[in-house]
A protein has these predicted regions:
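Chalcogenol-based redox active-site neighborhoods
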Residues: 1-167
């Protein structure tokens, strides 16, 4: 087995890149686009799938930390290739109060645009992006699929946005 087959994490979009706009469903009757949040920071949390233990813990942590994200006026969007109905059941079961977006059809299109799609598995990487108010990638992180990346990196990136905006 080669190292490439053991660790095939994606190379996310570079810092300074304009974040690709997208429109994905959050419910059967509502779609969310990145551009609707222009003027405020956005956190994109790509995750492999609803119901897995690590994804469940990661999303529960973000629900707990949501008030901290909101102090920076940041919007949190969870994204996986699961369908809307799976997301709705998962959010209800886990008491999640932020949008979970279905990158379902065409499967992984947004994850591919952000260079975090795992084609062999048909899921996205466990990847995080912080996008500034102008729609520019300011921070990204790809975690091993079995590792919860936590929220510290996100909070540091949001703090840095605030410092950049103040100077």
């Amino acid at each position: 087995m080669t190292n490439a087959s053991v660790d095939h994490r994606a190379t996310p979009l570079p810092v300074g890149t304009e974040a690709p706009d997208f429109e994905l469903p959050s419910t059967p009757d509502h779609k969310v686009s990145l551009s609707e949040f222009r003027g405020q920071p956005v956190i994109l949390a790509f995750y492999p799938g609803d119901w897995s233990p690590v994804c469940s813990d990661q999303m529960a942590l973000y629900q707990e930390v949501l008030p901290e994200f909101r102090k920076f006026n940041a919007e949190l969007l969870g994204i996986s290739v699961d369908g809307i109905w799976s997301h709705l059941a998962f959010a209800k079961d886990r008491n999640l109060h932020f949008p979970l977006l279905a990158d379902f059809e065409p499967k992984g299109e947004v994850a591919r645009a952000y260079r975090v799609y795992r084609g062999k598995e048909g899921t996205s990487e466990r990847a995080l992006y912080v996008i500034d108010a102008e729609g520019i990638v300011r921070w990204s992180h790809v975690s091993p699929v079995g590792v919860n990346p936590g929220a510290d990196g996100i909070l540091s990136a949001l703090e840095n946005l605030g410092k950049e905006g103040a100077s």
